[in-house]
Amino acid sequence: MARRITLNSLKPLSAMSNHPSLTPTTTPTAATASTSTAPSIDSSTAPSLPSTFNQMIFEFNGVKYTGAPHAWMMPYRGFEQHMVNMVIETRPDATFSRFDDLLSAIVTALAVNGITATTSLTDGELVLLRFADLATRHASLPSPSPAISDWSQSVPGPLLDTLEYGAPLIPAEPTATPAPTPLAPADYPPPPPHVADPAVSHSLVALDVPDAALPSMPRASTSTASIPSLMSLPIASPPRSRSSTLSSSTSTSTPRLPGTVVPRRPSHIADDETYNRSRAAYAMGVPAMSPMYCTGKERHFEQTFYSAYPHAANGVWTAYQHSIILIAAPTEDISLLTLHNVEREQSATEAYHLRALDGATVARVAVFRLAPTMTCHDVHAMMAGHNVVSISGLAAAFMIRHKLTDGVFSKSFRRIVMGIDPVMMRHDPVPLHLFAILTDHRLDHAATHAVMSMRLALMQIESASYQATKAWLRGHLPVTIFASATTDSSSDSIHATILEADKGMRVADTPGSSTLRELEASNTALQRQVIDMDVQINALLRTISDLKSYTNHQQASHGYSIQQYLHSHTCVNTQELPLIQSVMGDQAANAIQAMRTHANEAARSALTDKVTAPLTAQLSDTMAHLHEARAHNGDLTAQLAIAETDAMTAANERDRACELAVELESQLATMQREYDQTTRALLQDNEQLQHSAATAEAAAVSAFRPTPPLTYGTAPSALPAVGPGLTVPLLAAAIDPASLLL
C-alpha cells in the first residue's frame, strides 16, 4: 500500500511548537513514513501550506513525497517519475524518510546525468526521456534489505508527531567512525580562487540535504553488521495523548536537551563539524576558510560568491557577474553595510551599485525589504532560486522580532552571508552572533536556552550607537583596507598589517585648565554672536511681515481698478498670463486670458482679410492666364503627338523602302551572276559547236579528197561523181577557207 508523506505531517510549525508535550529539540532516531498513526492537528492552529503551484509529487517505492523543489526544477513538471526512475537506476535499494532527502538524491542524479540549473530545458527533457521505461527495466532489481524495512518500522507511529526541525543546542559528539564524505569526480577540478566561471556546472554532490537545523536520521545499510547498532539506537518515548496535551495549555515545561546526534548519512555533503565550519566561513564572507574550499563539494557556492561579492585578484578588482541578493530591514541604510561608494540604480526595483575609489564597479546589490505583514513563506519566496543570500544584522533582528526565522538560516542547499562587503563584515561581529544563535537553535528554543546571548545581540544591533559605529568605521577606516578583500587565506594578516601601518599618534596631550578657559571664553563669544544673529533674524522677520501686509493692502486698494481696466481693455497679448496670475489670481487671469485669446484670433482674421483682399483679383487673373496657358499647352502637345506620329510613319516607310532597295539590289546581283553564267555557257557551247563543225568539215574534206597516185599520170583524172543534189558551189560554200589552213 502506498504511503503518503505531506508537508503538513513533516512540518508542524506553530501548532506543534505550542504543544506542551512536544519539545522542539527532541530528535527521534527514526519515524515511520505513514501518516495513519499521527494524531490530527486542529485546522485552526495548523500552519498554512503554500499553494500547490510550486510543488511537485514524487512516488518512490510506493511512497509519495510532496514538497517545493528548487525553482530551476519547476519547468520539468510532468517528469517527476522520470526523475524517480533516474534515482532508482543509481540507488535501487535506497529509502528516504523526508522529502528533502529524496530531493537531494534527485538533484544529485540530475547533476550526474548533466542536468543542472544552467542546462537548457530542451536538453534536460531529452535526457529525462531516456528514463521513461525504467520502471519495467528495473522490475527485476532486488528489493530493499530487510534490515532497512525493519528499521523503518521499528519505531511506533506516534513518534512522527514529535518531528520538529530544530537544531540541537549541544553539538553532536564526535564519533570514532564518521560518515564517509563523498568525493568530487576526478574530472571536476576546483575553480580558481578569484575567477568565477559562469559556464561551470553545479557540483555533483547533494545540494538539498538539510543541515544542523534538521534532525539527523540514522544511515541505512544493507550489511548485517549494522543491524545491532540500529537496534541499539535510543528510542524516544511516544508523546502523550492529544487530549491530555491540549488540556494543559498553561504548561511551563521547557524544552529538553537532545541526546546524542546520529552521524549524517553518506549522502550528506560532509560531517557536522566540516559542514558547520563551512557555513560559518560563508557567514563571515570568507569562503577560503571553509574546510571544503576548492575540493569540488561546494563549487556552486564558490562560483556564486566570487561572481557576485566584491573581491580583488592581484591588486585589481574583479568585475561582478551576478547580483548580491540582500534581505534588509524596512528602513535600513544600505550604504552602512560597505566601505565602497553606493549608487542607486535607476530601475523599478531597489538595486545599488558598489563602486571602489578607482571608479570600478565591484558589485550590484538587489535589495528585498522586509515588512511587518510578511510571513515565513514570503521570506522563503524571496530566497527561492538563490543558493547564496545576504542578510543584514538589522534584518536578522527584525526577523527575530517578527518570528520569520524558521528555515531561513538552516538550509543545506543555501549559504547565508551576514553582509555584502567582506571587509565590513570583519568589523561587525554582532550579526555573526545572531547567525550562530539562529543556526544552532530554532527561535522558540533559543528564547529559552539562548535567551541571554540573543538578548545581548539584539540590544547591540537595535541600539542607536550600532549604526553610528558603522558610519564611523565607514568614514575612518584607512583607504588601503579596501584592497584587502582578496580570496587568499592570509587576509587576516593583511588587515592587521594595514591597521598597524595606519596607526596614528595623538598630536597633543589632554587639554589643561588654561586651554579649557580659552575654550569657554570662545564659547561665550560664539553664544553672544548667536544671540545677536537671533535678534537680527527676528528684525528681518518683522520687516518681511510688514512688507507682506503693505503689499496685501496695495493689492486690495488697486486691485479693483486694475481688474476693471483689464476687463474693459481689448488686448491681444496672450504672453502675460504668469504676470496676470500673480496680480489678479488664477480665476480672473484665466478669464482675461480667454478674452485676449478670442480678441487675438479676431485680430488675426481681420488682418488676414485686409492683406489678402487686394491680391484676390490678381490671383483670379493669374489663375485665368494659367488655365489658358494650360489649354494652349494641351493643343501644342496634341499637335506634337500628331507630328511625332507622322514622323514615325515616314521613318517606317523609309525603312521599308531601304529594305526593298537592298532586296532589289540583291536580286539584281543574283540575276547578273546568272546572266554571266548563262553567257559563258553559251560561249562555251558556241566554241564547242564551231570546233565540232570544223572537225566535221575536215572529215568531209578528207573523205572527198582524191588519193594521189604513186606515179604521176597513172591515175585517172576524172572527178568523182557528185551525189544527187550536191553541187560544186554548195560544197565550196560549205567549206570554210580558214579551216583549210589547219
Curated annotation (Swiss-Prot):
Keywords from UniProt, A to Z, are:
Coiled coil, RNA-binding
* Residue span of region Disordered: 14-46, 230-268
Coiled-coil regions listed:
635-700
Per UniProt, the ranges with Low complexity bias are: 20-46, 238-258
Q: Which GO terms describe its molecular function?
A: RNA binding
User: Any keyword NAD?
Assistant: no
Family, as annotated: Belongs to the aquareoviridae NS1 protein family.
* Chain's role: Non-structural protein with ssRNA-binding activity. Is probably involved in the formation of viral inclusions, where the assembly of cores and the replication of viral RNA are thought to occur.
Give the protein's recorded name: Non-structural protein 1
Question: Origin organism of this chain?
Answer: Aquareovirus C (isolate Golden shiner/USA/GSRV/1977)
